[in-house]
From Swiss-Prot:
Needed cofactors: Mg(2+)
SMART domains with a match to the protein in the record: KH (SM00322), S1 (SM00316)
Name of the featured protein: Polyribonucleotide nucleotidyltransferase
Species assigned in the record: Nocardia farcinica (strain IFM 10152)
One of the record's GO molecular function terms: polyribonucleotide nucleotidyltransferase activity
Gene name, Swiss-Prot/TrEMBL: pnp
Gene3D superfamilies xref list: GHMP Kinase, N-terminal domain, K Homology domain, type 1, Nucleic acid-binding proteins
KH domain mapped to chain residues: 607-666
Length: 764
């Protein structure tokens, strides 16, 4: 892809002070999508504001503002990204008690992370002014997702805000949709900005963000990808499986779309951007500080970094750091923060140097080596399913809970999902890294990690028809030293199998890293060397150029997350790293299979849930007036009953006999076998009248014992003299008329014949 000075700008001034630019996204036979950026009409007091439209129906406002004074006490860039979902965007009133928007939804939080990850590294190093990006969803076509539109809107508003920002950043979702016709070479087409309906028929989809570099190529900055819920079904039907090679093709397919979006933003900025202001920058350290720290610490630090154990290594590094800071404190009085930052930088240089030149890592492993693995199941006594997965010092406890489908999470957001049957929650307590900190509601990082593990497992979960349960999976990070999110995937697979969930295939995950630099080769020549690392440590994650997490089965990828600091990764390097990840995943799956290979028997503490189908026109009869019938069944059997609009009935109970009793009662109403003359029942008197007693034989099926039959041959003046409501009465069906009305006679339990047959006197 090359840039040409003759390229015509897409930006125009539509009215005084209002500018817009357009990016046309051509999907061939799948049609064209239009992304339009407009500025100058809304939120004019923000440093930069842009309204982004997708096909004129979906409308997002992004406003970027910056603080006036720097927060020089911070040692990080204070960027905040917020996504505000407005329910009026979908023509809805919020479902909360106060009927207004409250805390952000999970979708909004995940979108914040999608925006933050590519935007943050695009700002100049050393910036300490607070920058806030607020994206408000004003209108949403229900067939579209807004998250990738939000990435572009946030980038565009930041690009024109006069900030030291090296954008623009383009974001696109591409989905691999299988070919339906005879020509299926390549397995399908990567479609940009797919609709919700198109995603339902896709094999794989990914959100990719990047920017155009000087060469005209697109540097990928962030990837969030997943296999779809129907991937196994589609692959069995002949669709292309989302292997590592297919994923790499998808990244290449996304680049032209990202380039168009970046150029539309750049065109808008050329007309409407404010001049870049001068902001004070606070470099982490001065050159003199770095030289002093390097000279004082390099030799000892190099030895400390070869210690294999995390705690022992970190204790030694902390000891060296304190000694160096004490030694240099007088020379650099008042610059203690610079000393700490320089020490970190020297550590980073040594870690990378050891990897690139020696081919060894700080814990002594080779580049593709995995740490010691351990897997066991059934570690929490009363849990429905549990497992403990360890990879080196990373330790994850997975716990599964099963319940009725009615316990599925109800989702009140702008997304197409209204309920979640599978819920994955990830907890990262401070003790997992040997620290103290806040414990309580999950932070954005925890929500993001839980969502990644959830996406990795959804493709292999059984359907609701095959397994009629709501499933809550909790991942507890008990120890952390590298990729607890991928450890959560492994622990969750084990825990789900232990709970008896019939997964379509086991899933494992691994975190990969990439380190690159210009080095001198054996011939004395300079070359750029790329080294992929398997199963990265926390330090390698922090000091590397790219980290990506890959989860999947033995056959294909189910989820992928990638973040890189490089301006482009050669495709062969990425393909090699993905292949390396596949080998590691297979090794982990082998270890997991030794712990548990097939679903266990369900825990005795888990509810037994059965799904049955009844005619839709019988739902009212099963429920009864004011819920009388269903409440009676629940009371009699102790089962929980949930009825869907399509006639699916979920029956749950703590034991099998209770569930079966409830099912029999429901079937007796909804799928009745008509009773026959001569059948006997032990019924309950449900009503008395002047002419007889009504006896319930089955739920919803009553018969009448005439007053003349109640006296055992003697005349009865009043029905209540013989029976009352609630009494048990053994009866036999004497007759069923053509309208289905049942006539009953009492049965003497000690005799073979009905009691009323002996004397027929008094019959009216």
């Amino acid at each position: 892809m090359t840039q040409t000075s003759e390229r015509k700008s897409s930006a125009v001034e539509v009215e005084p002070g209002v500018f817009e630019s357009v990016a046309l996204i051509d999907n061939g036979s799948y049609g064209t999508r239009t992304v339009r950026f407009e500025t100058g009409r809304l939120a004019r007091q923000a440093a930069g504001s842009v309204v982004a439209y997708l096909d004129d129906e979906t409308m997002l406002l992004s406003a970027t503002t910056a603080g006036k004074t720097p927060k020089d006490q911070f040692d990080f860039f204070p960027l905040t990204v917020d996504v505000e979902e407005r329910m009026y965007a979908a023509g809805r009133i919020p479902g909360s008690f106060f009927r207004r928007e409250g805390r952000p939804s999970t979708d909004a939080i995940l979108t914040c992370r999608l925006i933050d990850r590519p935007l943050r590294p695009s700002f100049v190093d050393g910036l300490r002014n607070e920058v806030q990006v607020v994206v408000t969803v004003l209108s949403l076509d229900p067939k579209d997702l807004y998250d990738v539109v939000a990435i572009n809107a946030a980038s565009a508003s930041t690009q024109i805000a006069g900030l030291p920002f090296s954008g623009p950043v383009g974001g696109v979702r591409v989905a691999l949709i299988p070919d339906q016709g005879a020509n299926s070479a390549g397995g399908g087409q990567w479609v940009a900005f797919p609709t919700v309906e198109q995603l339902e028929g896709a094999v794989f989809d990914m959100v990719v963000a990047g920017r155009v570099v000087e060469s005209g190529d697109v540097a990928i900055m962030m990837v969030e990808a997943e296999a779809t819920e129907k991937v196994i079904e589609l692959v069995e039907g002949g669709a292309q499986a989302p292997t590592e090679a297919v994923v790499a093709e998808g990244l290449e397919a996304a680049k032209p779309f990202i380039a168009r979006l970046c150029r539309a933003q750049q065109d808008l900025a050329e007309l409407a951007a404010k001049p870049t202001e001068e902001f004070p920058l606070f470099p982490p350290y001065g050159p003199d500080v770095y030289e002093a720290v390097e000279g004082a610490a390099e030799a000892e630090l190099g030895e400390a970094l070869s210690i294999a154990g995390k705690q022992e290594r970190e204790e030694k590094i902390d000891e060296i750091k304190l000694a160096v800071l004490d030694r240099l404190a007088e020379q650099f009085a008042g610059r203690e923060k610079e000393l700490g930052a320089a020490f970190r930088s020297v550590t980073k240089k040594l870690v990378r140097q050891r990897i690139l030149t020696d081919g060894f890592r700080i814990d002594g492993r080779g580049l593709a080596d995995i740490r010691a693995l351990s897997a066991e199941v059934a570690v929490v006594p009363r849990a429905h399913g549990s497992a403990l997965f360890e990879r080196g010092e990373t330790q994850i406890l997975g716990v599964t809970t099963l319940d009725m489908v009615k316990m599925a999470q109800q989702v009140d957001s702008l997304g197409p999902e209204t309920s979640k049957r599978y819920m994955h929650h990830y907890n990262f307590p401070p003790f997992s890294t040997g620290e103290t900190g806040r414990v309580g509601s999950p932070k954005r990082r925890e929500i993001g990690h839980g969502a990644l593990a959830e996406r990795a497992l959804i493709p292999v979960l059984p359907s609701q028809e095959d397994f009629p349960y709501a499933i809550r999976q909790v991942s507890e990070a008990l120890g952390s030293n590298g990729s607890t999110s991928m450890g959560s995937v492994c622990a969750s697979t084990l825990s789900l199998l232990n709970a008896g969930v019939p997964l379509k295939a086991p899933v494992a995950g691994i975190a990969m890293g990439l380190v690159s630099d210009t080095v001198t080769n054996d011939k004395g020549e300079q070359e750029v060397r790329y080294v992929a690392l398997t199963d990265i440590l926390g330090a390698e994650d922090a000091f590397g150029d790219m980290d990506f997490k890959v989860a999947g089965t033995r056959e294909f990828v189910t989820a992928l997350q990638l973040d890189t600091k490089l301006d482009g990764i050669p495709s062969q390097v990425l393909a090699g790293a993905l292949s390396q990840a596949h080998d590691a995943r297979t090794t982990i799956l082998d270890v997991m299979a030794e712990a548990i290979a097939t679903p266990d028997e369900m825990s005795p503490y888990a509810p037994r849930v059965t799904a049955i189908k009844i005619p839709v026109d019988k739902i009212g009869e099963v429920i009864g007036p004011k819920g009388k019938v269903i409440n009676q069944i629940t009371e009699d059997t102790g089962a929980n009953i949930s009825i869907e609009d399509d006639g699916t009935v979920f029956v749950g109970a703590t034991d099998g006999p209770s569930a079966q009793a409830a099912i029999d009662a429901i079937n007796a109403i909804a799928n009745p076998q008509l009773p026959k003359v001569g059948e006997r029942f032990l019924g309950t008197v449900v009503k008395t009248t002047a002419f007889g007693a009504f006896v319930s034989l089955l739920p919803g099926r009553d018969g009448l014992v005439h007053i003349s039959k109640l006296g055992n041959g003697k005349r009865v003046a009043k029905v209540e003299d013989v029976v009352n409501v609630g009494d048990k009465l053994r009866v036999e069906i004497a007759d069923i008329d053509n309208r289905g009305k049942i006539s009953l006679v009492p049965v003497d339990e000690n005799a073979d014949e009905p009691a009323a047959d002996a004397v027929d006197a008094g019959t009216e």
